[in-house]
Regions:
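Alpha/beta-hydrolase superfamily serine-hydrolase fold, recognizing
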Residues: 4, 9-292
Length: 292
């Protein structure tokens, strides 16, 4: 019964709402099964299974795109994750140009609910699941993980790659590092973050903080899943101090949490440094440790 209650709460909340490491991000062009988790055309995910017999543990990947663009097909299916016996799920969600916050969070959570309900039929073991996101997708992956924690359905882990974590401090963090944001100020009315929220970040900084992972972590004092955080120390869009804030807030919420945090020297916002070499190796090791 407790499991049923937790599941009911989760469903209600959702409704209301890449040497060898290079292989990590090599695309696999076939074998993905498209699945609708809602009625909107953007509410779809795809599932790629490893060879062999399931059910398989799951890596759920959330694409970036400043909340206003992007598609799950932008994410290459990581072959060595499949080779490790882990299924790959890529999620689409509604975009801010047509659907403001919290539609994106609602969709990511609804996708997880769908996997929990229908995972067995898809060859998946949704009780063994890690969320991974890039950029805006990292914001959503971490947010979804926290929603799951809040209803007692914590994922096995989270991977956050160069994501914004607190809209209210993004400009200040860039200023601290002596940088000018390449896409303009987050506080501006036409920033991706302001357009997502439906109001300029500068006009309601407290609310902009409260809705994001850092603000939510302020209110959490319970066990959190392991997290891997990687961010370029030359990121021109999102200051690496956002990753540091995430690490510190995660630890404050759960002093016993397992946190694998590192900056990527010379790396900007995404690209090859996150697709090959050490970062790819680290992600695969994290997935293997938490899922298999």
């Amino acid at each position: 019964m407790p499991g049923l209650i937790r599941r009911t709460l989760l469903i209600g909340g959702a409704a209301a709402a890449v040497a060898a490491a290079t292989l990590y991000w090599r695309a696999r062009s076939q074998g993905a099964t498209e699945v609708a988790y809602g009625a909107d055309p953007r509410q779809v995910l795809d599932v790629t299974l490893p060879n062999g017999d399931g059910p398989f543990p799951v890596l759920v990947m959330v694409h970036g795109g400043a909340f206003q663009m992007g598609d799950k097909s932008d994410l290459p299916i990581p072959v060595d994750v499949l080779d490790a016996g882990i299924a790959v799920v890529r999620v689409n969600y509604r975009l801010s140009g047509t659907d403001p916050w919290p539609a994106q969070a609602d969709d990511c959570l609804a996708a997880i609910v769908h996997l929990q309900r229908e995972g067995a039929a898809l060859g998946l073991d949704p009780s063994r699941l890690v969320l991974l996101g890039h950029s805006a997708g990292a914001f959503l992956a971490v947010s979804t993980a926290l929603s799951l924690v809040e209803v007692g359905l914590s994922p096995r882990g989270v991977v956050s790659l160069y994501g914004p974590m607190d809209f209210s401090t993004m400009d200040a963090d860039m200023a601290t590092l002596g940088r000018v944001p390449a896409m303009g100020a987050t506080d501006a009315p036409d920033s991706p973050e302001s357009l997502l929220l439906g109001y300029p970040v500068a006009e309601n900084r407290a609310l902009a903080r409260r809705m994001g992972p850092i603000g939510r972590l302020d209110q959490i004092r319970e066990p959190l899943p392991p997290i891997l955080i990687r961010h370029g120390d030359a990121d021109p869009l999102v200051a690496d101090l956002q990753a540091k804030r995430l690490r510190e807030a995660w630890l404050a919420a759960d002093p016993q949490a397992q946190i694998d945090y590192a900056l990527v020297p010379g790396a900007g916002h995404g690209g090859e440094p996150f697709e090959t070499g050490k970062v790819a190796e680290d992600i695969l090791a994290f997935l293997t440790a938490t899922l298999t």
